[in-house]
Amino acid sequence: MALVALVAGARLGRRLSGPGLGRGHWTAAGRSRSRREAAEAEAEVPVVQYVGERAARADRVFVWGFSFSGALGVPSFVVPSSGPGPRAGARPRRRIQPVPYRLELDQKISSAACGYGFTLLSSKTADVTKVWGMGLNKDSQLGFHRSRKDKTRGYEYVLEPSPVSLPLDRPQETRVLQVSCGRAHSLVLTDREGVFSMGNNSYGQCGRKVVENEIYSESHRVHRMQDFDGQVVQVACGQDHSLFLTDKGEVYSCGWGADGQTGLGHYNITSSPTKLGGDLAGVNVIQVATYGDCCLAVSADGGLFGWGNSEYLQLASVTDSTQVNVPRCLHFSGVGKVRQAACGGTGCAVLNGEGHVFVWGYGILGKGPNLVESAVPEMIPPTLFGLTEFNPEIQVSRIRCGLSHFAALTNKGELFVWGKNIRGCLGIGRLEDQYFPWRVTMPGEPVDVACGVDHMVTLAKSFI
């Protein structure tokens, strides 16, 4: 540091020793400039900080995509700077955030979900506040958020992560395990007090009786569901329906059934969670997936089952019908045992035991612009996820689906995305659609990801 300051001082002396500068001028103005420039030079010297071997990596949350709904939780993206005119340094509004942006949060987030223009975050904390919401709230899918100007009114847009109140009996003992979001409703899964639902219940998707002409805007209503044969271990919101998986491996559903997405053998609405039968009868299910109107389920022995909408060939391997109202076993050759499934609006994906990703349906499926539709799964080349002869151990460990895009996490902590890049939802720095997996760069290691319609949220760990 001293050497840098000495060099800076010598350079300064040479500049000030020119004609017209006397000794008094050097003493008064030159000395202050010398100190200032020496300080600036010292500040430019890189500082190396060493991290201990036992230092904990910090939790991070990154968001990107369309911001004007408030779903990204960054108010400055939505609200213009206050004041009569532009201020120096004021940030302009940002309609689209095309690359990952770090969301400043004090809480350790364990689950995230993206709805149609809104976001839920949850933590397994023992604190009273366990869930935070942001974004569109016209159906109270984020709960009631009281207006600061009028205490009797609530916000229809929540621009920053705000606490969601849950009617917990034992708030310091109960933990929130997972959140899920649909088009205008939300589910919150707890470990001790069942499942809570909020938002639009026009089709019974919140698991309660449909009330004619019910007003959902600025509603305080949070419904609790506990009438399951077993403990619910996973929830999944479709567009206007809900799925519940219990620790007994059984699947329950409620909500809109016009495409058969409730899987209950009819096409009507169902306002109370009801157990599915069909080919799922007696099957031990370990995961359910839905987001649009098609549903998939994975069994413990690696089997795959599907029901609901099949207009885009999602279930064309077993039926010509475009609506399937009971679960059907999908016998796909060459896929192997299925570990995970993801289901969007028109496309589906599964991950097998070898870490390979298979896609089918309609749209941008991930194998280039020539593959537009397929009734049977097509494997995406593992090399597109980073597999090489120098990195032979790389494989995909987790898959997710938004309405029209996909995401995959690898065992090396890398996130790949592909599909329709609606309002920059892929986070790849440009707005064009992506026809094959592309790695998303961010200052952290992704551990989980949530996909919406036009935005995404990633939970990550700091590198050091």
Curated annotation (Swiss-Prot):
* Matching Gene3D superfamilies: Regulator of chromosome condensation 1/beta-lactamase-inhibitor protein II (2.130.10.30)
Q: Which UniProt keywords apply?
A: GTP-binding, Guanine-nucleotide releasing factor, Membrane, Mitochondrion, Mitochondrion inner membrane, Nucleotide-binding, Repeat, RNA-binding, rRNA-binding, Transit peptide, Williams-Beuren syndrome
Q: Which GO terms describe its biological process?
A: mitochondrial fusion; mitochondrial large ribosomal subunit assembly; mitochondrial small ribosomal subunit assembly; positive regulation of mitochondrial translation
User: According to the lineage, what is the superkingdom?
Assistant: Eukaryota
Which cellular components does GO assign to this protein? mitochondrial inner membrane; mitochondrial matrix; mitochondrial membrane; mitochondrion
Q: How does it assemble?
A: Forms a regulatory protein-RNA complex, consisting of RCC1L, NGRN, RPUSD3, RPUSD4, TRUB2, FASTKD2 and 16S mt-rRNA. Interacts with 16S mt-rRNA; this interaction is direct. Interacts with OPA1; this interaction is direct.
Query: Looking at the record, which disorder is this protein connected with?
Result: WBSCR16 is located in the Williams-Beuren syndrome (WBS) critical region. WBS results from a hemizygous deletion of several genes on chromosome 7q11.23, thought to arise as a consequence of unequal crossing over between highly homologous low-copy repeat sequences flanking the deleted region. Haploinsufficiency of WBSCR16 may be the cause of certain cardiovascular and musculo-skeletal abnormalities observed in the disease.
Chief location of this protein?
mitochondrion
Alphabetically, the GO molecular function entries are: GTP binding; guanyl-nucleotide exchange factor activity; RNA binding; rRNA binding
Give compartment(s). Answer: Mitochondrion membrane
What this chain does, per the record?
Guanine nucleotide exchange factor (GEF) for mitochondrial dynamin-related GTPase OPA1. Activates OPA1, by exchanging bound GDP for free GTP, and drives OPA1 and MFN1-dependent mitochondrial fusion. Plays an essential role in mitochondrial ribosome biogenesis. As a component of a functional protein-RNA module, consisting of RCC1L, NGRN, RPUSD3, RPUSD4, TRUB2, FASTKD2 and 16S mitochondrial ribosomal RNA (16S mt-rRNA), controls 16S mt-rRNA abundance and is required for intra-mitochondrial translation of core subunits of the oxidative phosphorylation system.
Instruction: Provide the protein name.
Output: RCC1-like G exchanging factor-like protein
What's noted about domains in the record?
The RCC1-like repeats assemble into a circular seven-bladed beta propeller structure. Each blade is composed of four antiparallel beta-strands with loops between each strand.
